[in-house]
Amino acid sequence: MVVACGALALHVRAIAARRGWEVEVRAVPPELHNRPGRIRAAVEEAAAGDDVVVAYAHCGADLAGYRRLPGAHCYEVFRGDAEDEPGVYYLTDFLVRSFDRVVWRGLGLDRHPELRDDYFRHYTRAVWLAQERTPELDAAAEHAAARLGLPLEVRETGDAGLERRLEALLCS
């Protein structure tokens, strides 16, 4: 079984189907990224005592004792081993699709748009790590970057990085 962040669950399911892995995937609400102290309890509840692999990077959560994805952030599984780039706000397909709900409303910017510049003042650009590029997602990525007041760069990454990391966890 894989307990996955909702931001990764669709990708995990698609990879499992493509690879023929018979694995149940249970998703945990992605909004918990805004409240990382609640992630462990949600993972434990979803796991229900079963032996699980956790499709979360660190994400600010204490997931000690679980086999999980390496790295500090889920975008690292799509970005690969590239160095962190100061000033970059990373977007994944999930964040592009759900930007208004998860980021804009999730951070209260719908009620207090004046906070945008405080929250994002240290960012110089948005980078969309595109797993599956479509015209609809292109438009949504442009919308997200515009709301942040940042120029957009697109890097087509696919999901191979996530697939390699899942394989290491599930097939070891």
Model regions: which residues?
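Hydrophobic/aromatic-rich structural module bridging two neighboring secondary-structure elements via a short loop
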Residues: 46-76
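Extended, histidine- and acidic-residue-enriched regions that form the cofactor-binding/catalytic faces
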Residues: 113-172
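N-terminal basic/disordered segments at the start of proteins
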Residues: 1-19
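Long, charge-dense
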Residues: 64-105
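A short beta-strand-loop structural module common to alpha/beta enzyme folds
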Residues: 21-38, 154-156
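Glycine-rich, highly charged phosphate/nucleotide-binding loops
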Residues: 36-48
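Structural motif
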Residues: 4-7, 29, 56-58, 129-133
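Active-site glycine-rich loop that binds ribose-phosphate moieties when present
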Residues: 41, 104-116
